[in-house]
């Protein structure tokens, strides 16, 4: 595009895309997934759910998520990311509203699987927009700000859900699902108003496009490449699998562990979960930006190291101070891996193939999310404690550190 045809405004619309993307992640992952950890104890009491059933409910959500990420890039290409995101968020909102009326394990299982379908069909195109709207040197920061939406959602859920449970009683979780559903619906409307599929729609170049001379272009060879034949995509997928397997065990069961095994009240456990949300607000921007500076490999190794320590601290049942440290270490890196991974994929395959590559790697990530809570729930059922599950998560995080250490530098941006 000729230089005269590209606007360079003082405030780039790409940051509006980041804000809209953050709202989308808040809705589809924050409310659609991470609120579950706060809701499970009261749902389990009312619906008489076992540990293994709690794990399978989380797994069902990830099965839906997994199915949708396989086709999300295809549908984003056909109808556009903006429209797909809107329809997917509507799916999340409606399914969450229906969960509020569930009467047993099977109904929750099926409806929450549909929520997962909507979550995946939102997340993949949202993260794919990062490569379209931002140059390589800005992608980590942009993705980092987008993923903090989950942190805001955790803070809201950590305060709202215990309050409703105290006010309404044992059935308070139903009101929580309904209110969260309404918020997702409002975000869907806001997102469709703000999102655009690419900077060309606004007559703009990507953010930071003029900061390198010349900007790196994937070229015709990369533009026509088959991402499924690139070994690096599978390698990134393996690392992302380990993240999916481990982080979701903590996110799903830490509140249940605090309430059932440590004797915490639901309100106090909610305060702990709210602190995770607050600390996580810094995770994406800080570590995404850090990975722009020190490289994706070093960024991944630092994050997985802190996560491994977090899992070990809660597994060992040490005194309260160590529990606080576990919460801190988990929170400060909570959403770092998705932001680094989205940026890394853009680095390796370029903006044109980014959405498809993110979709495929997220599919592998989803396999980890499916396996983690199911195995952790069954293990806890057999041992009577989640300690073994958290030890397992720490071991898998250690494997992720090792894999990240052998990650090679990308050839394209």
Residue ranges and their predicted role:
Residues 274-283, 289-344:
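C-terminal transmembrane helical hairpin of 12-TM major facilitator-type secondary transporters
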Residues 36-40, 229-282:
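Extracytoplasmic gate region of multi-pass secondary transporters
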Residues 113-148:
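Cytoplasmic helix-loop-helix junction between adjacent transmembrane helices
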Residues 145-200:
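Helix-loop-helix hairpin linking two adjacent transmembrane segments in secondary transporters
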Residues 95, 106-114, 321-329:
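Paired small-residue
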Residues 48, 80, 101-106, 263, ...:
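Helix-breaking motifs and short loop linkers at transmembrane-helix boundaries and internal kinks
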Residues 90-103, 306-318:
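C-terminal ends and interior cores of transmembrane alpha-helices
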Residues 29, 114-126, 330-341:
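Core transmembrane helices of Major Facilitator Superfamily
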């Amino acid at each position: 595009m000729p230089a005269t045809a590209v606007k360079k405004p003082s405030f780039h619309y790409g940051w509006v895309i980041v804000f809209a993307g953050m709202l989308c992640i808040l809705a589809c992952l924050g409310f659609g997934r991470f609120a579950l950890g706060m809701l499970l104890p009261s749902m389990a009491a009312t619906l008489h759910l076992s540990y293994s059933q709690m794990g399978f409910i989380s797994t069902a959500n990830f099965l839906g998520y997994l199915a949708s990420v396989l086709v999300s890039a295809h549908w984003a290409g056909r109808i556009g990311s903006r429209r797909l995101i809107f329809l997917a968020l509507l799916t999340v909102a409606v399914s969450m509203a229906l969960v509020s009326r569930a009467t047993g394990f099977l109904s929750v299982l099926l409806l929450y699987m549909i929520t997962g379908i909507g979550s995946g069909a939102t997340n993949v195109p949202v993260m794919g927009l990062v490569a379209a709207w931002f140059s390589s040197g800005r992608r980590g920061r942009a993705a980092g700000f987008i993923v903090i939406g989950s942190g805001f959602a955790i803070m809201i859920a950590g305060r709202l859900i215990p309050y409703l449970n105290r006010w309404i009683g044992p059935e308070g979780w139903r009101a929580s699902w309904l209110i969260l559903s309404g918020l997702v619906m409002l975000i869907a409307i806001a997102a469709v108003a703000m999102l655009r599929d690419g900077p060309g729609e606004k007559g703009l170049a990507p953010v930071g496009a003029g900061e390198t001379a010349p900007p790196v272009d994937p070229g015709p060879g990369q533009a026509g490449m088959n991402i499924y034949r690139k070994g690096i995509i599978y390698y990134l997928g393996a690392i992302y699998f380990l993240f999916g397997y481990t982080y979701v065990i903590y996110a799903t069961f830490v509140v249940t562990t605090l309430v059932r095994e440590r004797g915490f009240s639901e309100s106090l456990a909610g305060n702990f979960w709210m602190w995770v949300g607050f600390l996580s607000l810094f995770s994406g921007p800080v570590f995404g930006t850090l990975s722009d500076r020190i490289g994706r490999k070093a960024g991944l190794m630092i994050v997985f190291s802190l996560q491994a320590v977090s899992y070990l601290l809660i597994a060992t049942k040490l005194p309260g101070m160590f529990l606080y440290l576990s919460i801190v270490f988990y929170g400060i890196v909570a959403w770092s891996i998705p932001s680094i991974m989205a940026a890394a994929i853009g680095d390796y395959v370029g903006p044109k193939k980014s959405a498809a590559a993110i979709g495929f790697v997220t599919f592998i990530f989803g396999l980890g999310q499916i396996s983690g809570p199911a195995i952790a729930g069954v293990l806890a059922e057999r041992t009577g404690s989640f300690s073994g599950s958290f030890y397992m998560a720490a071991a898998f995080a250690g494997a992720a550190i090792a894999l990240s250490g052998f990650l090679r530098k990308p050839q394209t941006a």
